């Protein structure tokens, strides 16, 4: 998915694969249920994924691991690779298992991996590029979310990703040895779980698909 910079230099995403795990849309973002009917919520979740993948287009590859046909179709339409989520029903750690599967799929061709949340509708391509450049200075690092408790992106350069997403993932990644990156990348930190998160991201400025989906459903 990569290109070149305006001066002809290789972009910071060269040699980097982004992996994004997406659960079934019907099961995603249930904390948005107070403001969206089920079908509308799925539409918004899919729009956020599309805006996130579009913002990551400058990296060497983007792989979306998902069991959801609509998410897979949308990712392919943007030029992303799609991996059918191999995680069995009832797995105790489905998100991290899906990310490890995606990591294994891309490691043969790309040495460096970024696990990115798929709900970053305010993400700007330049923010991700700057974060990747900062991450290159250490083997493993992460960007925390705006609340300081979650993780928006986990970077692994030449080492295993070792994802530990879930409750208090920022602390879990920190304890596992990942270095926290402190750059000013607001769009990279605004992942969406609650109505307040979505409102904050809209104030910051969301991508076209999310803006259209949210506007249509309000």
Swiss-Prot record:
Binding-site list for phosphoenolpyruvate: 151, 166, 169
Recorded superkingdom: Bacteria
Enzyme class: transferase
GO biological process terms held by the UniProt record: F420-0 metabolic process
Listed pathway(s): Cofactor biosynthesis; coenzyme F420 biosynthesis
EC nos: 2.7.7.105
Pfam family, one: CofC
One example GO MF annotation: GTP binding
Reaction catalysis annotation: phosphoenolpyruvate + GTP + H(+) = enolpyruvoyl-2-diphospho-5'-guanosine + diphosphate
Keywords: GTP-binding, Nucleotide-binding, Nucleotidyltransferase, Transferase
InterPro entries: CofC, Nucleotide-diphossugar_trans
UniProt family annotation: Belongs to the CofC family.
PANTHER family recorded: 2-PHOSPHO-L-LACTATE GUANYLYLTRANSFERASE
Cited function: Guanylyltransferase that catalyzes the activation of phosphoenolpyruvate (PEP) as enolpyruvoyl-2-diphospho-5'-guanosine, via the condensation of PEP with GTP. It is involved in the biosynthesis of coenzyme F420, a hydride carrier cofactor.
Record's protein name: Phosphoenolpyruvate guanylyltransferase
Species of origin: Mycobacterium sp. (strain JLS)
Source species taxonomy: Bacteria, Bacillati, Actinomycetota, Actinomycetes, Mycobacteriales
């Amino acid at each position: 998915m990569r290109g070149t910079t305006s001066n002809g230099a290789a972009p910071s995403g060269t040699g980097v694969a982004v992996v994004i795990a997406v659960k079934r849309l019907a099961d995603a973002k249930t904390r948005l249920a107070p403001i969206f009917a089920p079908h509308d919520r799925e539409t918004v979740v899919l729009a956020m994924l599309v805006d996130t993948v579009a913002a990551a287009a400058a990296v060497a590859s983007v792989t979306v691991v998902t069991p959801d046909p609509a998410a897979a179709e949308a990712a392919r339409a943007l030029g992303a690779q799609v991996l059918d989520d191999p995680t069995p029903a009832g797995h105790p750690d489905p998100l991290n298992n899906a990310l490890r599967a995606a990591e294994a799929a891309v490691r043969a061709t790309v040495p460096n991996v970024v696990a990115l949340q798929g709900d970053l509708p305010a993400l700007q391509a330049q923010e991700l590029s700057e974060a990747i450049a900062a991450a290159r200075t250490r083997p493993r690092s992460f960007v925390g979310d705006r609340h300081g408790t979650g993780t928006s992106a986990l970077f692994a350069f030449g080492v295993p990703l070792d994802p530990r997403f879930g409750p208090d993932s920022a602390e879990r990644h920190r304890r596992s040895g990942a270095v926290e990156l402190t750059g000013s990348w607001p769009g990279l930190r605004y992942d969406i779980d609650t109505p307040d998160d979505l409102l904050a991201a809209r104030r910051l400025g969301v991508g076209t698909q999310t803006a259209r989906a949210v506007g249509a459903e309000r």
